[in-house]
């Protein structure tokens, strides 16, 4: 496990204990960076038109298409720190 993998794992745990809930924009960004960092480019069909939450998540992840998993992990770690993470 690399140093970045350890930081990414720590950030995932830390995000669950943030004292203030991130706003919707930051939540979508966290979701997209997590998915890109753990799975890579978006896979599977886009959710249906009336699945607003699923569509928003899919589109946020889709915007990161082509971003390396390592870069997404680093951005995730930095965002969690910005939101008050202390790991």
For every predicted segment, state its role:
Residues 1-87:
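A charge-rich, low-complexity, intrinsically flexible signal that marks solvent-exposed coils, linkers
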């Amino acid at each position: 496990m690399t140093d970045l993998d350890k930081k990414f794992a720590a950030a995932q745990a830390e995000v669950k204990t943030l004292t203030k809930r991130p706003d919707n924009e930051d939540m979508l960004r966290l979701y997209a960076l997590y998915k890109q960092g753990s799975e890579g480019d978006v896979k599977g069909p886009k959710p249906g038109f009336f699945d607003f939450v699923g569509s928003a998540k899919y589109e946020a992840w889709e915007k990161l298409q082509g971003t390396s998993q390592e870069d997404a992990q680093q951005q995730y770690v930095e965002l969690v720190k910005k939101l008050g993470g202390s790991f």
